[in-house]
Amino acid sequence: MKSARAQPDAPRLLAWLPLLLALLFSAVTLLPELRAVANLNDDAFHFLLVQGADGALSGGANPFDFWSPVLELGFPQFLYYQHLPHLSIVLMQRLLLGHVSLITVFNLVRYLLLVGFPLTVFWSLRKLNFSHAGAITAATLAPFFAGNFGYGFEYDSYVWRGFGMYTQIWAMHLSFICLALLCDYLERGKNRVPAVLALAALILSHLVYAYMMAISAAVLFAVGLTRSNARQRSLRFALVWTLSALITCYFWLPFILSKVYLGASPYLQRWKYDSFGAQAILQRLASGDLFDHGRLPVMTALVATGLLAAALTRTRQAVLAGALFVTWLLLYFGRVTWGSLLDLLPMHECLIMHRFIGGVDMAALLLIAVGAGWLWQFCGRWQPGRQTPVFVLLTLLLMLPALVERHGFYRLNDVFLDRSARAVDQDEGAATLIERLRTLPPGRTFAGLRTDWGKDMKFGDLAFSDLLTLNQIPAVSAPYQSLSLNADLLWDFDYRNPDDYLVFNVRYVVAPSLEPMPGFLKRLQTAGRYTLYEAESGGHFALGRSDLAFEGRQSELLGAARAWHARALGAAGEFPRVALKGMQAPPSDLVSLPLADAPRQLGGFAAPPLPAGSIAAQSAQSQRYSASVQLQDPAMLVLKVSYHPNWQATVDGVPVPTVMLLPSYIGIELRPGAHEVVVAYRSQTVRNLLIAFGLALLVLLVVLARPRKTPGFSRWP
């Protein structure tokens, strides 16, 4: 009896072999990603956010909205940046009772998400009613995209030598899960609450992919639309998106209302906004370079097979896959092809269209499932009794070029990672100075940029500034994301100019010991091949004046700030007021000049003498700064951190307004006399109320999803 029952199970077990091999391959080749090494890519930024959320929670601050002082002269990243993936790490580490370090949990979650991606693809495709053979094949090939660092599903986007796009790993999983659950709800009315939760999680994990999911969901909605189901399908579609939007409104609503304080770097390459155009993308697709860079175009061939099968079979799954692929391929062409037509898209002005490759990759996996299912049927007609072995052999043969290419890629990744890890471990001087910096009084640290000797302070592929980020040491360094309005001005910092140390509050410098340094720097310590210097920075506060006022667009701010910096007006104590379009600036007696005209206006401006007075004492914490000030003249007290209205100031215990000053600093007007000034970061009350509302709605949905005897709830659309 046992052998008779086991016999039909043998082909089914054999069919899983390619997927198991893919999982094992990823599990082994990605093991180096578990090493606790500083990151040289955006994962350094992501882990800094994890550390910041953990510190905020430990210190009694709001983990959903806190000030991070380390990069870009400070910024409240979680107010604008997707944060569920980061908060999840903090929660997991606490569930482990702190026995496992944050960086270990961070790397482990990254590793498991990368290794487990095929399982999410398989589950989602089966939920979408793709064939078993097609789902297994697509899941098997899911981790084997090779796009030559194209920012898509290829693991080049995630590994140590890649881009470190941690939140996109979550978005890959959630995009498939959302599509599957949405389909289930729209078609059968099942999984309403899981669909809402998945969409909400995607919104909080990756805004661009949530935007892309809205477009994919519209395609899904249209593919299954008939005259008989139009009303019910429309109600379900509207309900699931409305509920997910309400749950996450604490994030996207304040984001929209205060986006004027979010930087938009002019240094970001134009192709990231515009994409590459139809000709370049179609050439890459036809040559196999889009999915199979540097190897035989096996995935490209399966995508082509899927397109052919979709045209011939026209099943619901085939039509969905084909429609999604065409939609995303057309959108991926970007502004180079479509020009002003793309202005019809919501939020078109801030779309980074090169990331639409993610939609192309997701649709490609659906087409691979269609094509593989078609080949499975062909194998059944060709070899009726050997359908499974023949198909498995074909799949393994198709995997071989991908396995060879990916193995070479990951081996080089391991070489780079190991080289850098050993260099850091063997460099005792760097560790000594990092520990010294932890004990020194507050002040930012400069360890070079890519435009000066900073490029020579390397540990394999890591820079010294990467170690500063890992150790949460506030620094003037190359921006990772350019979220702050001050971020791009940091490229203008000149270590040879003593004024810049005052303007940016750079108190410490780490430089190569053999590098000639300016005489105004005081040597504190030499360790190994580095020397630590101290400069006169004036601290986080400065006394100044504000004799000019400008008003204009955010895009005009950097030009004004660079002109102000070039004229050394900050060191002279002149900090003009700035009101950006969309800001609510306090009233002023000054006449506002056009911000676009600031470079000309500042070029001929002579700063008046500094107001008489002094800063007797000052202190700095991550969420709070304070100063004791003695003034003989009216003055503007300047806090040299990025301006944001969530900073609330009190003078002698009385709340006072703050103003935005060039470059994007905080200003507080003071009268003559002795004053105690406190400036603290406070999350907006409305955002905290929206968080409570979202959590309450989430709990309510879960409760209502439980089986009930009351019939009314079961008749939701």
For each feature predicted by the language model, list its residue ranges.
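Active-site-proximal, structured, solvent-exposed surfaces of multi-pass membrane proteins
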Residues: 590-709, 713-716
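A structural micro-motif
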Residues: 324-328, 443, 647, 654-656
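Charged, low-complexity surface patches
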Residues: 39, 81, 114, 426, ...
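A broad, low-specificity signal marking well-ordered, structured residues that form hydrophobic/aromatic
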Residues: 328, 357, 531, 625, ...
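Short, charged/polar, Gly/Pro-enriched secondary-structure boundary elements
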Residues: 352, 537-544, 637, 674-678
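Extracytoplasmic
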Residues: 56-57, 119, 207, 400-632, ...
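Short helix/loop capping segments that flank catalytic or ligand/cofactor-binding pockets
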Residues: 212, 254-255, 368, 455-456, ...
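Membrane-embedded transmembrane-helix bundle of lipid-linked glycan/lipid transferases
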Residues: 2-421, 432, 441, 508, ...
